Each structure stands twice: as C-alpha cells, then as structure tokens.
Amino acid sequence: MFKLLTKTFAVPVVTGLVLTGLISGSVSAAEEEATVAFPDKFMLRLGAYIVDGADTQFSVSSDLGGLGTVLDYSRDLGGDSRDTIPRIDAYYRFNSRHRIDFTTFAVDRKGSRTLLLDPPIVIDGIDYAGGTINSQITYTLYKLGYAYSFYHSPKVELSITAGLNLTDYDLKFSDDTGAKVSQAGITAPLPMFGLRMGYAITPKWSVHYVAESFFIEFEDKLRGALINYELNTEYKLFKNFAIGAGLARIGSSLNVNDDEWKGSVSDSYRGYTMFGTLYF
C-alpha cells in the first residue's frame, strides 16, 4: 500500500517539478533575451548601394620615370562617378557580448577619353598619349570583423570593432582598336578598428552607426589608410524581417612599391543604401 501511495503521489510531483523547471527555464531565457536590445543571433542583409559620388586618383609610370602622372579617373579618363550595386552584410552573435560581422560589395566603373597629357602616359610599357584610352576599374571589398559589446542595455548597444578589410583593385586599359591592352592589380589586406552604436527607438524602429579607420606602413613597400562611416535606420515589419535605408562612405589610400607594381591609388565612395534584413 505504501509503495502504491508513493508511486501515486510521486509521479504527479515529479511531473510537476519537471514542467515547472522547463517553464522557468523558458521564462528565464525569454527574460534574458528581453533585457538587451538586438538579441537576434544571426542577421543577413541584402541591399543596394547607390554610389552617388566616386573619386579615384591613381599614378601610372611615365617616360620621365618615378611614379608618373597622377590621373583623376572621372576628369582625365571619363570614368563613371555613379553606380548602383548589390551589397551583402551579415553577422553571427555568439552571445550578448561577442559577434562577428561580414560585408562585401564590388564597384565596376568604366571610362573612355582622348588623352592630351604631358608627360606622355605609359602603362605597362605601352604609350597611350594622344590617343583614345578605354578603361575599367573594379573595386572589390571583403570585410570580416569582430565586435565586442562593452555596453548592452535594453535600448543601446555600444561595441568596439577590429577586423580586416581585403581591398582588391583591378585596372584595365586599352585603345580603340584593342591592339594596346594593359592590366594592373592591387590586393591589400588593411586592418581596421572602430566603434559601433545601435539605438532602439522603439521595439521595431532602430538606428545604427559605425565609424572605422586605420593606417598601416610596411617597410617601404606598402602604405595605406582606410576610413569607413555608415549611418542607417531600419524598421521591423515582422519579427524576422526589417527594411531600412542609410548613408555610407568608404575611402582608402594605397601606395605600393614592389617588383610587380609601383604606384598609388586614392579612392572614395559615398552614397546611400536601401536594404531588407532577415533576423534569426
């Protein structure tokens, strides 16, 4: 009889304790998630980067030696200064303090202009002075960063960031006939450090800002600088989907002096972003 009573009362009690534990755990997890802004573990953002102004200057070799003539891509070579390109951003959050970020986009610009410059322009041993030169510059960025949230409240997240910007330039030049073709390329991994801020105006509406910069000098072969500023706002239409828009500017300056290429590139892109964001 005692065993029967024990079994009769023990089963409901144990079941109740298990359910209570599960419910308490779920409530605690939900409360912990609700205590900080932007608790989502994974973010994927697909959007358009509307480049409203692109400024590019680079040096090429000349018959006079040295770094040669500095060309303004839009003014001297008729290069495009506006473009609309796809852009991808993502992050993975390990917990409320630590996350990794990823960004990539590519700007492909073309130009055509008759050169009337002195000294004559010689690229890869080919003289383009006095003729029509067709050009193409492709700028590709891959950015991988780490963010540490030193302040994370129900309204605000402040983070310091560190990472690597892999900057790739491909330059191509040719004449009207296609008989003269020159190509050059620069790939520079530039480290960067910065600050991120997120502010939840309401549970659905938020504002985000990021500022990053760095300068590096390696022996006499590479000298580079980087700046990146972004300001955007987004609104959550649903729990896992938001739309937004913002302002973005990125600039870099590279001076290269090695056996493969000697020259410099100064580049700046500014414009607007429009995007849709998935949260999980």
Predicted regions: what they are:
Residues 46-48, 88-92, 144-148, 162-164, ...:
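Residues on the lipid-exposed face of transmembrane beta-strands in outer-membrane beta-barrel proteins
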Residues 29-107, 271-273, 277-279:
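Short glycine/proline- and aromatic-enriched beta-strand/turn motifs that initiate or cap beta-hairpins
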Residues 206-219:
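Transmembrane beta-strand segments that form the barrel wall of outer-membrane beta-barrel proteins
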Residues 54-83, 106-140, 166-187, 216-222, ...:
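Extracellular/periplasm-exposed beta-strand and loop segments of Gram-negative cell-envelope proteins
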Residues 97-100, 154-156, 203-207, 239-243:
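Repeated loop/turn-to-beta-strand initiation elements of outer-membrane beta-barrel proteins
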Residues 225-229:
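Charged helix-capping and loop-helix junction motifs
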Residues 1-40:
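Cleavable N-terminal export/targeting peptides
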Residues 47-51, 105-107, 149, 163-167, ...:
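Outer-membrane beta-barrel pore domains and translocons
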